[in-house]
A protein has these predicted regions:
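Bacterial Sec-dependent N-terminal signal peptides
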Residues: 1-52
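GH16 jelly-roll
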Residues: 46-296
Length: 296
């Protein structure tokens, strides 16, 4: 926006001034609409960043390296969730590996999380689930993730957040924030969801909204969430998708006054992602992440 504003003030405005001085009204009037549109695009269309009260970059991951994900920023959730929550609580079909470049790596400036059709530890698929827990934990702020997600029936990619210390109890009492979820049988659709004790998927009261977004598996999009003490806002490419307000009734509805951390994963199958089965012909499938930025 800085370059665009300099273009307006130093180049475009003087040219327009001279044009209006030399032109009659018949020439000027048909030009007004086009000029207004140009001004809107260049100068009057604020980004999420310019609207936000959070301006200070406090954490970022640009993936400007090669190999395994940076261990100072990322840990792995491992296996199939057993013995605590086998299938990760959703009857998912993948085995999450760690320190294995076939499933999680950085290359060409992107994080790659790859789901593969292969047997491991009694499961028929492998993938990865990365988390910033105890390496990046935040209360309030704006998080933005530029990503391109996989396609195919049975895929279940997610960009989401969980509480770091579970101070209000186990799921869903301490909350869950889903910045972006997609299931492969709903191509070109993404959802943003909040789970709490009062509002959650187990009792079908979760606060969720979606948007039809063509090209989610062929182009990068920016998935964002802004979190204050009073409200959460969810965006795709700067356009609001969902919001959730603190109704001040207590932690059953709003447990979001504690630190949360970020998770990135590609699940396979499960209660929701596998509702219509898994198409084995689509493997391997990848989620690519270009960058992640957290402002407070």
């Amino acid at each position: 926006m800085k370059v665009e504003r300099e273009f307006l003030s130093r180049i475009l405005l003087p040219l327009l001034f001279n044009f209006f001085k030399r032109s009659d009204m018949k020439t000027i009037l048909p030009s007004v609409a086009g000029i207004c549109i140009l001004f809107f695009i260049l100068g009057c269309n604020p980004s999420l960043n310019s609207q936000s009260k959070y301006k200070k970059l406090v954490w970022s991951e640009e993936f400007n390296y090669k190999g395994l994900p940076d261990s100072t920023k990322w840990s792995y959730d491992k296996g199939n969730g057993c013995p605590d929550v086998c299938g990760w609580g959703n009857n998912e079909l993948q085995y999450y590996t760690w320190n294995r470049t076939e499933n999680a790596r950085v290359e060409d400036g992107h994080l790659v999380i790859e789901a593969r059709k292969e047997d491991m530890q009694g499961m028929k698929y492998t993938s990865a689930r990365l988390a910033t827990k105890n390496k990046g934990d935040w209360k309030y702020g704006r998080i933005e993730v530029k990503a391109m997600i996989p396609a195919g029936r049975g895929m279940w990619p997610a960009i989401w957040m969980l509480p770091t210390n579970w101070e209000y109890g186990g799921w869903p009492r301490s909350g869950e924030i889903d910045i972006m979820e997609n299931v492969g049988y709903w191509p070109d659709s993404v959802l943003a969801t909040v789970h709490t004790e009062a509002y959650n998927g187990m009792i079908n009261t979760q606060k969720t909204k979606g948007v039809h977004q063509p090209g989610i598996s062929t182009k990068f999009h920016v998935y964002s969430m802004e979190w204050t003490e009073n409200e959460m806002f969810f965006y795709v490419d700067g356009k609001e998708v969902n919001r959730f307000a603190n109704d001040k009734t207590g932690v059953a509805a709003w447990p979001f006054d504690k630190e949360f951390h970020l998770l990135l994963n590609v699940a396979v199958g499960g209660n929701w992602g596998g509702k219509f089965g898994v198409d084995d012909s689509v493997f391997p499938q990848k989620m690519l992440v270009d960058w992640i930025r957290l402002h407070q």
